[in-house]
A protein has these predicted regions:
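Lipid-exposed faces of alpha-helical membrane segments in multi-pass integral membrane proteins
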Residues: 10, 38-45, 65-68, 85-95, ...
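A cytosolic-side transmembrane-helix exit/cap motif
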Residues: 52-56, 81-86, 103-113
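Membrane-interface loop-to-helix entry segments
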Residues: 58-65, 155-165
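Interfacial segments of alpha-helical transmembrane regions
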Residues: 69-99, 104
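Extracytosolic (periplasmic/ER-lumenal) interhelical loops and adjacent juxtamembrane/interface segments
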Residues: 111-155
Length: 222
């Protein structure tokens, strides 16, 4: 949680550095945001007594359902700046969790991040979502093997990095004035052959929040 808050604060600072304004964050209006609430909420629902510790299949299925909902949200909003990175990160985390029945956490990463108490807890009884990384785990490069030192104190995965970078991109782009593009009502793209000798106007590049202000294509002022 501390790392997430730090990423958000850093993103806001970067937004100001690039000429953004905080009030423009209201332009972030994702579709189907209820999938995020449902997907995250599933992870906090207590499983029946004994299931979390003994029934690996049910535990894995619950986590897979949670991440599936979050990935669906990312795909439905993939045109938003940075959302494709968030979706990639979620897919990476889901893959390693499903393959290993939970997210493996490196003991060394926990030590380097100052989480000896978490290490002792996982060694003693484990957790619903995490377990200590072992030689039997697969795709360990996607596990929680990256240590973020104190004062953050957290072990993260490659997927987490993708999510945080995508979130930063989204916040900075929104603060700089990004807004969802909308086609005028009743307008349709022209089809068919162009008249001979006619020149086609260059199509605008997709705006991911980093085009110069007022520009529709790179290298143009209007």
């Amino acid at each position: 949680m501390k790392l997430l808050l730090a990423v958000v604060l850093l993103s806001v600072c970067l937004g100001y550095v690039f000429g953004g304004r905080l009030h423009r964050l209201e332009s972030i209006r994702p579709r189907w945001w209820g999938l995020v609430i449902l997907g995250l909420g599933i992870q906090f629902v207590p499983l029946p007594e004994g299931v979390a510790g003994t029934d690996l299949a049910i535990r894995t299925a619950v986590l897979a359902l949670s991440y599936s909902l979050l990935i669906a949200f990312g795909l439905l909003n993939v045109r938003m700046p940075g959302m494709f990175l968030v979706t990639i990160g979620l897919a990476c985390n889901m893959t390693v969790i499903v393959v290993n029945g939970g997210m493996p956490a490196s003991a060394q990463a926990l030590i380097d991040s100052g989480q000896e108490d978490v290490l002792a807890y996982l060694q003693d009884q484990g957790a619903d979502k995490h377990h200590l990384l072992t030689d039997d785990d697969q795709l360990t490069f996607l596990a929680d093997v990256i240590a973020v030192p104190q004062p953050i104190g957290q072990a993260v995965s490659v997927g987490d990095i993708f999510v945080y970078v995508g979130l930063t991109w989204l916040i900075v782009a929104a603060m700089r004035g990004w807004a969802p593009s909308a086609r005028p009502e009743g307008s349709r793209p022209r089809r068919g052959k162009h008249r001979r000798g006619a020149t086609r106007e260059p199509e605008p590049l997709p705006d991911f929040g980093f085009l110069p202000p007022g520009a529709t294509t790179w290298g143009t002022g209007r």
